[in-house]
Amino acid sequence: MTASSDRPTPGGPAAVARHAPVLYTLRSKAPMRISFAGGGTDVAPFPEQRGGAVLNCTIDKYAYATARVFDDGRGELLVTSVDYDTSAHYSLTADLSYNGELDLVKAAIKVLRPYAHDRLASKRSIGLFLHSDAPPGTGLGSSSALCVALVGAFAHYLNQPWTPYEIAELAFRIEREELGIRGGRQDQYAATFGGFNFMEFGPDRTVVAPLKIPREILNELSYRLLLCYTGTTRYSGGIIERQQAGVRAGRSESLQALEETKAIAVAMKNELLRGNVDELGRLLDEGWQLKKRFAEGITTPQIDAFYAKAREAGAIGGKLLGAGGGGHLLLFCDYERRAEVIRAVHALGGEAIDFAFEFEGLQTWNVRPPGPGGPTSTTPSARARGPDSGGRGGSSGTSRA
């Protein structure tokens, strides 16, 4: 197989890489997220027409990218994906075609190649190892987290001082524009910034506002929330396409549900800041009832059964995470009934997933100290740089990266 091939090769990266000297190794990780309210209002064309708002937070489930740089004179990208159980190697300068195999990596190469002239001239190869704590299609934004981790690793390798807004927009561009994967903007921004955020989406700007929630409120919220895997994954593209079609057609039910969902995101943010944790269950349930009106296919009989049994067992409210059709349910419980809800979920074949809130976003670091011409330091935390660092959004509302 030629170096420019984009066909996966069993053992390809390991076979090529192990004979070349490793100059240095760097790693990145980006967190996944749970969305409390407003999901769907970040999906075009709704935010461009009416403005969107989302309340979400990141959790301790991550997507990882490890890059080893080889001085081999080949100029290749050697990829191993644990999630897809596949390996391949590509030329960093050749044209690449999309065929359903590691397309996210190929799109990242295409979009980021203009920033890599000096590195490409060196003819060094990169061994890329990718894995995630949750598979795609489970509603946690894992694909976008992986894309952000990829952008972060390449930014570190290229010594690019991109702001969090620019990194999030590059990840959005790779997924939504280059690959045409349907979806909104919240996932890329959540994975980049990390923490509890209230996000506002408009036609030409995104603003990320970190929420300062007291520790005791976070502890109570953590205790009363349950993350439950339903045992099914889903392809969300068709659901999102139907939602987009409803907005473009001006379908009143879709538009009204999205407007009310946006209002719930604002209300939930305010209740959290006031410390009114008890209100979250009711608002989650209201949001879930509205979400089912966005488009056909958001819920299924199995999901409805899960939710009904959880409510019977003591859940006050909850919602399906992601676009719909499968994945994870987020449930809010009375503290006395938490164990009963977990038993009800297990009885239906589901699984309660342990999680904790994560307050850092994208992180990159050196594993092995770089030699001359390598990255000089770790990438600063997105949260440390704040929400007004440039790119698409911030107080200036500057153009997209």
Give the positions of each predicted feature.
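C-terminal nucleotide
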Residues: 1-37, 42-48, 54-122, 169-182, ...
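Short, conserved acidic/polar surface loops in the N-terminal third of protein domains
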Residues: 90-92, 138-142
